[in-house]
Amino acid sequence: MPLMVLLLSQRTGGVAQLLSVHGLDTHRRNNLVLLDEDTAASCIAGQLVLLSLSTGARRYLPGRDGGGVGAVAVHPSRTLLAVGEKARPGPASAGPAVYIYSYPGLEVVKVLRGGTERAYSALAFDGERGDTLASVGHFPDFLLTLWDWRQEAIVLRAKAFSQDVYGVAFSPYFEGQLTTSGQGHIRFWRMASTFTGLKLQGAIGKFGNVELSDVAAFVELPDGKVLSSTETGELLLWDGGLIKVVLTRPGSRPCHDGPIEALLLDRPAGRVLSAGADGRVRMWDFGAVNDAEPREDSHSLELSPLDEVVVAEGAALSALLADSGGRRWVVADKAGNVYTVALPPAGPVGKGAVVTRVASHPAGAVAGLQLSARTHTALVASADGCLRALDYVSGAVLAEAATPQRITAFTPLPAASPACPGGAMTAATGYRDGVVRLHARCAEGLALVGVAKAHKGAVAALAVSADGGRLVSAGEDGSVFFFDLTAQPQPGTGVPGMPACGLLAPRAFIKLPSGSGTVTCGVWEAAEGGGVLLGTNRGTILSVPLPPPDLNTHHSYEWAAGTSAVSSYQLVVPKPKRPKKKKGKNDGEEGDKEGGEQDEGQGGEDKGGEQADGEGGSKEGGEEGRAAEEEEEEEADDEADGGAGGPSSTTGELISLTLAPNEPGALLVTAGGVGHAARKAWRVRMGEPLAAPLLEGFASAPVTCLAHAGPEGRLALLGSGDGLVRLQALEEPFGSAAPGALPLWEAPLHDMQSGRVSGLGLSHDGAYLVTAAADGALHLLALALPPELAPPPTTQPGDEPLPGPAALPLRPPDVLAAAAYTLEEEKQQAERDQQVREAEEKKLSVRQRLGLIRAEFEALLAENEAAPEALRLPRADLEVDPGLRALMEAEALRREEVARLELAWESERQRLGLAKLRRYFLDGLESERVVLHSLRGSSTVTTFRVAKLSDETRAELAAMRQAARAAAAASAAAGGEGGAGGRDTDARGKGSDTGGGPGGDAAARARLAEATAALEEGTASGKLNKADLRRLARKRREAEWAAFNGTRPDDTYDSPADLAAIEEARRTIGDFKLKSDPNYVVPEEERLTPQRKRLAMLELEEALHDIAAAFNAKFFALRDVKRKVLADVRVKLAALAELAAAAGAATGGADPDATAAAYLAPFSGLPSGLLPEEEPAEAREAVTDADLAAFAARKAEDERKAAAAAAGGLGGFAGAAAGPKKPAAGGAAPAGGALAGGAAGSGSVAHGAGGPSAGGQQGLTAAEEALAKMMAAVPQSELEKGLAAYNRRRVEHMRSKLSEEITAMLDAFDDAHSALKAEKLGLEADVKAGQMRLLVGLQELQLLREFDKRESVLLAKRQAKLDDKQEIVDKIAECTDKLETKRLELEGLVARRAAVVAELDAVVPESDPFREALVRVFHRRIKRSKKKAGGGGGEDDYDSEEDEEDEDMGDDEVDDDDDGGEEVCPPGCDQSVYERVCDLREKRLDEEDMIAEFTKTIEVLRKEKEALAKKQRLVEQGLAAVNADMAEFQKEKQGRLNQVEVIVALRMHQIEYLLDGCLPDDLSACLVFSASQLRRLQARVDELEEEKAGLRAAHKELRRQHAALLRDKADKEARVAELEARAHDVQMLKFGQVIDLELLDRVSSSRGTEELREDLKKQELAYARELAEWDAKINARMDELVVLTRENTACLNAVSELTAAQRRLESGLTATRKGLFADPVQQRRAEVEERDALVALVNAQAAELDRLKGQLLALRRKDTSMYA
């Protein structure tokens, strides 16, 4: 009963059913988990395999997303199972999902989507509860995602790394922490709370000096440390993201011989388990690992394992699991074996453990597959180097042959081949080391029947001839080797040392021409004696001829002539014909189907067929987008290739070459890469230029496997590079499929990433389909083929022939060494070995002759010595060659000259080497480390090891300082100019704000000027009465009030000075802004840039250098002092020694030596001079006598050894020559002794100070001694005793004085030494802090350089806005100046017009009876000639309409329009007065024309200023936006800078952060604050208090002034009220009512008011009648418009109906037109005419509508001008 059925489409369901999946992917890391005590789970291809550990039975859980299964994880409760899958890319793909299954029910509980783009590579549940699931994606995103899987929600996500991640695990001890590891990295994660929320923060482990390694396994220890594996076999202990210690075995051996693939912590047993590629599981003491500390001289620690269990010798272990009780392990190796290790209850684990192999499965990528023609047996070649015989129905491994090298090529041998013993299954395999092997299946397994190393590199392809008699092997080194396959091993080649190759008989090899590429596949030509056709990775087919049978290969297998005989054929395929897209839906879909495949292929990837498809929208949108893309690609391809359908050569690799059985000379070819050639299988005829398409391939990946089955090859089996398998029925044998035929069956059986199909085959009875791929899986499917496609019954029923040992040829010696010679190298080496053997034999014979001659000569010498002295021959007569001595002396001289030259060369070499070392180690140093000892005690102080500041650093520092100074100067200059400009702008702005606009303050000031001028003129002329003067005075007062009120600011006005003061106070408040505040924005002057940071770093580096250099100067000065002190002390000690001698002489019987020792004892420990470590440079250059003596001894020893060797080499012939040389060696001794004595003598100079005294004591003569004894016997007199006592006291005084002086000198030096040491300690701390600050600065500099580009863009934007603003401000200022000038001029003009009016009042007083008529004449507007500055002709007249439009006087006087009548002097009026009024009118009109012109100019300037102000507001808004972006950017930059960790050393008294009176364990929330800043803030508080007190006093004074002003205001208001009351009382008393003075003025000044009222009434009646007439006309036109609108609507409806009818008629005509004659030209012409008529009708109606609308608008206007 099949476990599952794969139905690829509903049409073809039931064709194939999956029965089993053989293989185990043990090469994938972390791919084995325990579900329960008896079940393990592993992923392979698209299945999750459930393996029973007790029976070896397998169950399968199929994948759901079609791309394979990527990872698996088990819930801590073992009731749930998480499976992360892979999804094939495409528009319909929703991406891979993580499915949560229940166990053991295997039902889907939850589905997690959106965690990665293509595939999952690792999964893990957290802790004991398992509430959180961690998933890691594969290429291209590598996303680490944390899931709340119960809610199917993503909690956090981050990119794990940029390379493959092998595993992920939560910390079992610390919540919120997890670890990932993979290719070249390990990363430690924690869920951290930041100011933007919860985030995943990952710290990458830094390998430092340890070699970078892939981390396949890791385990976390309880204290947070992590133990990880390496590729080299060591264990790394991580602590805080750094390697704490590297663990090795004793002897610096790695923990395992090979990579460590699994780690396990057995906490109850207190041990750590590790499994490696050496087949062993080693146990390590947990305590020793956890507490491991590195040695002082190394970063490693040697540990001995507690025990080890040998699982399997030579097995590369890949997984290690332990059951819940910890008493059984489950182990897997890379060969596909699964073991259980039962641990003993007590005693040593290594001895008591029982290892049981549970199951053996094929593992590793499958390189080839061969199915038996008789039984259900297959030969499977795995890439791990193992060839297996497999019963694919039961899954049992029948036999296997393993080699240490990978299998890179595979081909089966036909049963008729001579190399198949007894017709048994035989296959040829090629390996990575260039070896070709033949294996035949026999009764005992797989027998090796042939082996030969043909190539230096890997074997790329193998091909066997149709008759099975020849084999060709192509290697990656560009060589092609031909073998003959024989039934029996061939005899040797006759060359000794050549190995036997079994059934492989080497024939010859050729080298391919350069540029041919690497061979990927091959096939033999069908013709008898034909050569080989080889496909390459460059898309070419090479025709290689067969070497001739008579080729001489005695000296070499190479056939040099064959290289030039190789011919090449380029695979050229026709370009696909892309059909043009039609608008119809069905046609569009077909076009998408046909052309879309090509487009998808162009975007695909070679490996795995992966595609980077974007997320599409709806189906229709996707189709439209693809159609547009296809059209664009078609156009581009047509332009590039000259049109679709042209030839196209492929540059991808050729994957397979097969002879077409039904057509001699034709090849079936499949190609890789991308493009059209990889989409199909092709039929290639070598004589034709183009290949013909044979079968449609796959849209996502190239065809990698092509086979035929069924009767006459009518069934094609295809496999793709991304794991798809297809069965295709063919229309003809070995031909193509029927047009439009769909696949018989197709399924994604293998992994989409690593599942390149490498083998397909039907069983001999057609009941099964077997597939193999690079993912290591072998799928067995039951087939239910149609009868016409089922293969015929087998003609060879029965069991597989298995020959016994007797029927097999002798096993040839296998080639296992990686450095073994190839066949060609073996042949060449064999000849060289033969020549070496002959030379050695010849040398041995010569040595034997020499030995006989030497023995004969020694016998003659002995006989001569035994003869009587008289009969003895002199030794000279026994010299064999008398000229030998002269030859030897000449040879000695020659060798001496050679030695001299060699010595000179060696001396120069040593000098250059020393100079190079000096240049490398010392030239860059300004001062090296020097130690200075104190004179008393063991205190030492050292210098700073200071490197010179490089010239580049100094130049960069100088340039940056110069740039900083230039920038500061430019900024100061810009600030000065900006301040002046700002003040000017503020002043102008203030004037503009308080002055109002032209219609406000300007008009008020103009009225004030007019009123003032009129009043002054009237007063001066004396012609006005008092009423007129009072009226003019009131107008002036009103104008003054208006002007005053115009200058009053509104309630929203803010003084610029106040705003500037507030901003200055806010800026200089003196508070301390915390940079950790998320809203903190760094001030402009404090913002860091890469240049500022680099300058600060350089200045800090220079300061550190200067500090160290200054200290070193003090140090060397103190060293000079020590040298001088020691010199002075030596002098004083010599004086003390003389005093000791004098004291001994004074005391008489005292021992002088004892006295000197007593005197010098306090200073016995003083050095005689500076020590070598105190003068390293001088000591390095100095060569002492001891060094010379040691060198002489070494040289003598070398000469002795050389002489001994020379004497031994010459044998007995050197006896006479060696004798006279012996005394010379002995004669060298006196010279050496003299040198030593000289050295000793020179060494005694230091103690020469005491020499004279001792010499005096030892140099007494006998008489002096007798005299001394005699004097000693004579008793001393009192004088002598007194003199002796005086001498003793004098000596003691001098001794104490000298001792005190020496002690004072020593103490002074030691005090200076102590002070210098204390200073060094402080400076060293400062220097280290500065160096740490440099490191922090470097990190900040890197961040600043990352942000610099964005900041530059923002600064450029802001500067552009500032420039625009400044330009606008300048324009506004210029415009304001112009306005002010125009206003002043306007006021003058208004005053001049007022003077004209006042002159009129003087000419025509109020009492004049003709005043009203003359005033009307004065104010009348007349047509005047336009005055032009240049004179000349032209149109001088203009209409008074322009005056009416351009002027608006706004006066209260009557403004009569010219009625067109003739103007005459009023009857009875004086003609001179009339003419004078006309002249004044002309003056008034001139002034009003100028006023109108100035008013127009002022209005233009005002509008221009308003436009500029509006533009300024827009620019300021843009500047504010840029400043906001800059502030956000600065916040982001400061946030990143805040993340840089800074080390601050604090003492306990500096920590003032207590919780409940105790220091908390976590200080992450505390704030580190500078004491200087704290003091500054405290001082600033005092300053602010003082400022507040001053401001309060100023405020109090202002309030007092304000109160005084209020009192003055109240007094003035009371005075005004008093005056108003008095005026009211006076008016009531005189007139009985309050007089309205303005009304009185108007009444008194307008005598014709009643007349004007009558005229006004008449005009109103006339205008009312005219208005009524126009309203009637408008109503009539409106009715007409409604009628026309309805008619137009009816026409439009008719047009719409006619258009619909036309379309229906066209559809009917189109449907019934097939077969009828129709003239398309006439139809087209009729359609055009009808459409033109409709367009003309619509245009006419639109024109009529526009005309009616225009009439309506004209009728609606009430201000229609008579001049219009």
Curated annotation (Swiss-Prot):
A GO CC term attached to the entry: nuclear speck
Coiled coil start-end: 821-850, 1479-1517, 1567-1674, 1729-1758
Disordered: annotated span: 570-654, 972-1003, 1426-1468
Ranges of the WD repeats in the UniProt entry: 115-157, 160-199, 208-248, 255-294, 361-400, 454-493, 495-534, 649-692, 707-752, 753-791
Residue spans of biased composition, Basic and acidic residues class: 585-596, 604-628
SUPFAM superfamilies: WD40 repeat-like
UniProt record, GO biological process: cilium-dependent cell motility
Biased composition (Acidic residues): 629-641, 1434-1462
InterPro entries: Beta-prop_EML_1st, WD40/YVTN_repeat-like_dom_sf, WD40_repeat_dom_sf, WD40_rpt
Function: Flagellar protein involved in sperm flagellum axoneme organization and function.
Name of the protein in its database record: Cilia- and flagella-associated protein 44
Organism: Chlamydomonas reinhardtii
